[in-house]
Amino acid sequence: MSKDKDIKVTPGTCELIEQILALLSRYLSSYIHVLNKFISHLRRVATLRFERTTLIKFVKKLRFYNDCVLSYNASEFINEGKNELDPEADSFDKVILPIASMFVKCVETFDLLNYYLTQSLQKEILSKTLNEDLTLTAESILAIDDTYNHFVKFSQWMIESLRIGSNLLDLEVVQFAIKCADEDGTNIGETDNIFLQEILPVNSEEEFQTLSAAWHSILDGKLSALDEEFDVVATKWHDKFGKLKN
């Protein structure tokens, strides 16, 4: 692991990390909110009871992740960096590594959840209910995929730009894209595959903050679009199915 000692743990970097974690918490919360509504509707569909149980398990996992994110306090590392004899005390790696690990954990879970939610579950709903009242919209599925792709890329950027990469931080979807590109002889410099786009290392706190701010803006926009589509879907579920409870 290569470390850039020019980047230290400062109040500025801690504030930046808190903003990054806030985005991850928002991502998790968006799913928790919409899935809870979905689970509530599924309670009245006996043929989908096992699917409902699976979603409950996912929600519990996402809620646990969110609790971990919300309880993380990056500023604690500033106080730990007072001992000048400890060369690692002020290292930015010390605070960013657990965050990178959490991002990897979350996006890998979203990978499984998104596959289940947008593909296999949609087929089960159609085959067991014979209608589309509880299905996702095409637009919501696109938003789910787009948001996921950008969070994966941000996770990849956070790891590779700081040169803290490890096989324990590898993302399956990225490694699969690289493998396919190698087998196909794809020119990475010309591909539009977001996972294959080059990531350059950062060499200062200012550079990391500038690029993180740009990423924050991108992810904020993706989450806003995702929330809009989730709202549309939740309204559809209520209008076509939820009113049956009255």
Curated annotation (Swiss-Prot):
This is SWI5-dependent HO expression protein 2. Belongs to the SHE2 family. GO terms for molecular function: RNA binding. The keyword Transport applies. Keywords: Cytoplasm, mRNA transport, Nucleus, RNA-binding, Transport. Homodimer and homotetramer. Interacts with LOC1, MYO4, PUF6, SHE3 and with RNA pol II subunits RPO21, SPT4 and SPT5. A motif (Nuclear localization signal) lies at residues 15-23.
